[in-house]
Amino acid sequence: MSIIVNVDVMLAKRKMTSGELAEKVGITAANLSILKTGKARAIRFTTLDALCKALDCQPGDILEYRD
């Protein structure tokens, strides 16, 4: 079981940089990098909400479950 984080896909679709996203969401570039590489062990709902608002997407566009 694994959760795949597709933030890079959404960044490309929105033509946005990681730095721009981190600033809009209110997290550090380092924390965004940890999330993007799948090394994060958890994500707060408030952070997920901010990501979805900044990227104009749904949680399922960012997170994917693979068995």
Language-model regions, residue ranges each:
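A short, Lys/Arg-rich alpha-helix, primarily the initiator
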Residues: 1-16
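Residues within the helices of the helix-turn-helix
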Residues: 8, 19, 49
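DNA major-groove recognition helix of helix-turn-helix/homeodomain DNA-binding modules
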Residues: 46-61
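Short, charged recognition helix plus adjacent turn
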Residues: 9, 29, 34, 41, ...
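Short alpha-helical DNA-recognition segment
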Residues: 16-34
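The alpha-helix within a helix-turn-helix
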Residues: 11, 22, 52
